[in-house]
UniProtKB/Swiss-Prot annotation:
Part of the 50S ribosomal subunit. It comes from Xanthomonas oryzae pv. oryzae (strain MAFF 311018). One of its GO terms (molecular function) is rRNA binding. This is Large ribosomal subunit protein uL1. GO terms for biological process: regulation of translation; translation. Binds directly to 23S rRNA. The L1 stalk is quite mobile in the ribosome, and is involved in E site tRNA release. The lineage of its organism: Bacteria, Pseudomonadati, Pseudomonadota, Gammaproteobacteria, Lysobacterales.
């Protein structure tokens, strides 16, 4: 089905202004003709924050209990020794210091996540213009600067997603694949929303989780009725 027909099919099944129970929202997305690839199920969460204020920007990470359905390649900056061994044992594709930095500068950037131990940031700092624009720069707020690189690697590979409010105060994130069963997708969404609630800025006033909508890779969003979720 062409994308325009797909969008129309989903739009026709959605009543304007209506919020759907999570299971019904997912059913609408799944019953539309699938693309030739397994699509992701994405979520957009509008938060009650003023994203223009630095103290109301929300940024962090969540380990989705059912995973993301994606294979994740991880590079770790850690000095030779116990920390490097820990990262390798956890499944990191590459571990190093200056040698790893040189490989990246030479064009080896085939990684989805870059992790660093605190004492390795002196090396990583030199790669800011290379890693920053690609969203790969390690940051303690999302767990990618860690004194426990083995744990950080396991989190990245087991379904960790990172989020950050955009200019409109909206979080965009993947919660799995269309091939996941409804309960897996629901548990992932609930885990994300619970972490967002924990990250609520102290200066945020009024309703915090203002709107939650789900969509498939090539489809429009369907608003989710938050009362159909367990957020306690």
């Amino acid at each position: 089905m062409a994308q325009s027909k797909r969008v129309k099919a989903i739009a026709a099944a959605v009543a304007p202004g209506k919020a759907y129970a999570f299971e019904d929202a997912i059913k609408i997305l799944k019953t539309a003709t699938k693309a030739k690839f397994v699509e992701s199920i994405d979520v957009a969460v509008r938060l009650g924050v003023d994203a223009k204020k630095s103290d109301q920007q929300v940024r962090g990470s969540t380990v989705l209990p059912a995973g993301t359905g994606k294979s994740v390649r991880v590079a770790v900056f850690a000095p030779a020794g116990a920390k490097a061994d820990e990262a390798l044992a956890a499944g990191a594709e590459a571990v190093g210091m200056d040698d790893l930095a040189e490989k990246m500068q030479a064009g080896d950037l085939s990684y989805d996540v870059v992790i660093a131990t605190p004492d390795a940031m002196r090396v990583v700092g030199k790669l800011g213009t290379l890693l920053g624009p690609r969203g790969l720069m390690p940051n303690p707020k999302v767990g990618t600067v860690s004194a426990n690189p083995g744990e950080a690697v396991k989190n990245a590979k087991s379904g960790q997603v990172r989020y950050r409010t955009d200019k409109a105060g909206i979080i965009h994130c993947t919660i799995g694949k269309a091939s996941f069963d409804d309960e897996a997708l629901k548990s992932n969404l609930q885990a994300l929303l619970l972490d967002l609630v924990k990250a609520k800025p102290a200066t945020s006033k009024g309703t915090y989780l203002q709107k939650v909508s789900v969509s498939s890779t090539m489809g429009p969003g369907v608003t989710v009725d938050q009362s159909s979720l367990s957020l306690k």
